[in-house]
Amino acid sequence: MQLSDFSFDLPKSLISFHPYFIRSTCRLMVMYGHTGMIFHKRFFNIIDEINSGDLIILNNTQVIPARFFGKKESGGKVEVLVEKILGINNILASIKNSKNINIGSKIFFGYKDKIKGSVVDCKNSFFEIFFHDNIDSAIDIINNIGEIPLPPYIKRFRNKLDVDLYQTVYKKKTGSIAAPTAGLHFDLPLLEALHNKGVDIDYITLHIGSGTFQPIRRVQIEEHIMHSESVEVSSSVIQKIKSCKKKGGRIIAVGTSTLRALESAYHSSEWSDSKDFISDTNIFIYPGYKHNIVDALITNFHFPESTLIMLVCSFLGYKNTMNAYNTAIVNKYSFFSYGDAMYITHNKLAPYENFII
């Protein structure tokens, strides 16, 4: 399959640069995978699509204030974007204006440049930085000097709404540099209404890295190598999934990150033994992949030629997905992180679809 197969023309006017003030009032497209039928609703109507006995699984990662600035020993300014917290005092990060930064280089951060960091390793395009601080940990330092990084296509200044609305209401475990955006549409009243309906709700953790915004640079998508991200799926979640399916309930994943975490766990030895799955994953899901767990997926409208739209195609079917996206454009849905949402059910025939463009 070629990268261009997943291209489409998106008017810039449909890119959302600001969040919905009331989370659950965004628009919702519903598409049933087995029929391709489409319905237009609001996100709070999603309660009508989910049944008592179903299990919703959300990604409880929390976005860290991963973007901050520092000075090189020469006085030159650098911008740091944390990719991963490696330990108590160590981070993995990309550095803008990284010319002449090598192993052993010193970078100074914070008020009056009192926080010193040393580059102790270089890994591909990332640098490992060690903070020389006997009091604060790396996460404490980041919380003190950093700011929440909005997606790179949003060029405006951040505001107080972003601090709140670019996090989910159920955030718990710090580590992402980008929000699990499908979850942004849930507010506490909606979660309570789902619970009162008899819907079970549980959580996994996948810390989203900068690779989620990186373009595919291969003509043939099968040659693409995914970035690696940290994932945790607890033994209790695995047991709940097995029990739910045994009773005839459905598994509903909120976000592509949740689906990828579950599929990664499924292919591990921990799944059959119902043990905690804690690992890194670089699973790449594209058309032809056979899904094993999720019956319905809640997701946003994604970038052309992205790994995310490829995952949606694998779940919903290529023709269904392209029809849904064309319908979204005609009906002026909002796209990307702050945009509108889809609720899609699994098309079991998708892996066998005749992929002819």
From Swiss-Prot:
Membership in a protein family: Belongs to the QueA family.
NCBIfam families: PRK00147.1, queA
Keyword terms of this UniProt record: Cytoplasm, Queuosine biosynthesis, S-adenosyl-L-methionine, Transferase
GO molecular function, one term: S-adenosylmethionine:tRNA ribosyltransferase-isomerase activity
InterPro entries linked: QueA (IPR003699), QueA_dom1 (IPR042118), QueA_dom2 (IPR042119), QueA_sf (IPR036100)
Organism in which the protein naturally occurs: Buchnera aphidicola subsp. Acyrthosiphon pisum (strain Tuc7)
Gene label: queA
Reaction(s) catalysed by this chain's protein: 7-aminomethyl-7-carbaguanosine(34) in tRNA + S-adenosyl-L-methionine = epoxyqueuosine(34) in tRNA + adenine + L-methionine + 2 H(+)
Entry-linked Pfam families: Queuosine_synth
This protein's record includes keyword S-adenosyl-L-methionine: yes
UniProt keyword Zinc present: no
A GO-annotated cellular component: cytoplasm
Record-given protein name: S-adenosylmethionine:tRNA ribosyltransferase-isomerase
Signal peptide: none
EC number from the UniProt entry: 2.4.99.17
A single GO BP: queuosine biosynthetic process
Pathways involved: tRNA modification; tRNA-queuosine biosynthesis
HAMAP family on file: QueA
Subcellular location: Cytoplasm
Subunit-structure text: Monomer.
Function: Transfers and isomerizes the ribose moiety from AdoMet to the 7-aminomethyl group of 7-deazaguanine (preQ1-tRNA) to give epoxyqueuosine (oQ-tRNA).
